[in-house]
Amino acid sequence: MDKKTTLEMIAAISNANGTSGFEDEVVAAIRPYAEGLGEITEDRMRNLYIRRKENNGKRPVVQLDAHSDEVGFMVQAICPNGTLRIIQLGGWVNHNIPAHKVLVRNRFGEYIPGLTASKPPHFMTEQERKAPLDMKDITVDVGAVSKEEAMEKFGIRIGEPVVPDVTFTYSETTDLMVGKSFDCRLGCAAILKTMHNLAGQELNVDIVGACAAQEEVGVRGATVTAQVIKPDIAIVFEGCPADDTCVEPYMVQTAIKRGPMLRHIDARMITNPRYQRYALDLAEKLGIPVQDAVRSAGATNGAAIHLTEKAVPVIVIGVPVRYAHTHYGISAYADFDNAVKLACEILKRLDEEQIRSF
């Protein structure tokens, strides 16, 4: 898959609207790029499985994982003045939410443009200006003037999803990508590009790609996919939060333009140290730039996959994303490309004996 096609794929998947529990549009965007790779199936949770056509069922199984959902919101109530109360789907910081364009899906599946809003400073007391912003003080304004208009003219009901209204862009000058949902649509794209790059090659493992739903609300999709696939080993792709603009220089472990990040630990998984060392050493040997990190917070689908059956060795190959879990992200294409390169090189070398050594 060449770079032009890869960027078109990333754009299509990034632009698709799909917060947790509402991944249908994302799955539909992924499917065309999975054609020809093998058997494509879905379950009732909207987890998408891509079983490599070269699989023979007699070799160890590698699960390639990424999650398809994005952080977003759900309409909780419609106020008498027509604005919408919302709850978070996934982890947001409240002060990052207001003053952005969003799309509200209505009962007919149409997307209604709106703005995330909070009380303007002109009408705030001094105490309100100094107080932390509470979620109950953030609304979505679609321009309705009453609850009745929001429901009847706009077709909005409670329980509908709300997503950032952002369109993917890429700069040839900087080789940077800007868009929404890079956590983890870059991971979904990495699965597809990895499988395309290995198409037709004889490997010593079977590969199943899984784009899992509902990661942002508790790795729920991966809990299912791991039970279905029953992997012997796994690679989790993630759009991981970059730290190069927000910590002391000596603490930077996830910078853009320095390669993918492999974490030793996060809040819900200690990475298999033997598998982790194998991946880091292989990257060094092949000259693939990588970063390794120790994380005290956050988690990935590895949290569910590594606890499957008798335990599964998992590494996380993360593409750094500045400002993850906001409306926008910035990522370097080279980091994405090197994440795919590392995954391909690992998969070319894995066999039953190597997997047992982990």
Report residues per predicted region.
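N-terminal hydrophobic/helix-forming segments and targeting peptides
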Residues: M1-F358
